[in-house]
Structures are given as structure tokens and as C-alpha cells.
């Protein structure tokens, strides 16, 4: 995590440069919109198309797949994408949930994605599963009654497990 949803920078410029170099050596990265902008040295994208182009710019010449997460953008639908180094793009959409229970969404998505990839899913399959799971976790986070009133509460990581 380089930049929080609040916009606060969580690391200094030297660490940002080190992360740029490290990110080019990993299989998959999951930056939020402000983090993606830092990785490519541009202003944060204001549209999904701009974010996808920034991801394509980043992974050009690398073997790194970039997950574009559209949660910081506006609209009734959240668009996310797997942007592969070979130019393949898979878009995964979910309805936007209007809630204050969004604390930890980026870390939760990254963890779910890594788990599904380790279980044998392709990155695209892993993102589809993870977005569906996270959408449910966000939608039901308010039922936890944590961080309220007025604060950002967590998503409900265990919602799906309790439905089994």
C-alpha cells in the first residue's frame, strides 16, 4: 500500500522508486488509482479507459499483469480489469454499493485474488471470483455495525461463509 484511499501517502519518494522497480519483477500487482498514477509518473486517471491505458503503459516491456481497480472512480458500476503484458484485457464489472463500509477493500481484493491464483485459477478467473466475493462483503459490511456512525467501517469478510 503506497497511497491510502484518503489520499495520504504512506511511504516516501525513495520507497516509491523501490516499489516501481519491484513491481516490474512480480507476476501481478493491484494498485489503486492513485498508486497506479505514481507507478507511471502521471496524474491519477479520471476514467476507466485512462486507468487501463496507464496499466498498459506500466506493463509494457515487463511480465507483470496489472489489475485495474475502478473503485476510486465514479459511476453506478465499478469496472475492474486484468491488463496482461501481451495486451489482453479482461473487464470485470460489479454494481457500485453506496456504503461507508469500504475499509480494507484493496487489501481484501488482493488477498482473495492471490488465494484464487494459488488454487489454480487464471488471473482473469481469480478476479471474477474475487470481485463477486468482495461485492458481497461490501454490501453486507454495514450489518457488522463497526465504525459507525460516520466512520469507514470494514467489509464483511465472513458473509459468504455464513451463508453455507
Say what each PLM segment does.
Residues 38, 100-123:
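Short, small-residue alpha-helix embedded
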Amino acid at each position: 500500500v503506497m497511497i491510502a484511499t484518503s489520499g495520504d501517502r504512506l511511504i516516501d519518494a525513495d520507497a516509491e522508486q523501490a516499489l516501481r522497480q519491484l513491481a516490474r519483477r512480480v507476476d501481478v500487482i493491484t494498485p489503486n488509482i492513485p498508486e497506479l498514477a505514481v507507478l507511471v509518473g502521471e496524474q491519477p486517471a479520471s476514467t476507466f479507459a485512462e486507468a487501463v491505458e496507464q496499466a498498459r503503459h506500466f506493463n509494457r516491456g515487463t511480465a507483470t499483469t496489472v489489475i485495474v481497480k475502478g473503485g476510486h472512480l465514479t459511476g453506478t458500476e465499478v469496472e475492474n480489469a486484468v491488463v496482461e503484458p501481451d495486451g489482453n484485457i479482461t473487464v470485470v464489472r460489479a454494481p457500485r454499493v453506496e456504503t461507508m463500509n469500504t475499509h480494507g477493500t484493496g487489501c481484501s481484493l488482493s488477498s482473495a485474488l492471490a488465494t484464487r491464483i494459488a488454487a489454480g485459477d487464471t488471473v482473469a478467473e481469480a478476479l471474477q471470483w474475487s470481485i463477486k466475493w468482495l461485492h458481497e462483503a461490501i454490501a453486507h459490511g454495514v450489518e457488522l455495525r463497526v465504525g459507525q456512525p460516520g466512520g469507514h467501517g470494514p467489509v464483511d469478510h465472513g458473509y459468504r461463509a455464513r451463508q453455507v
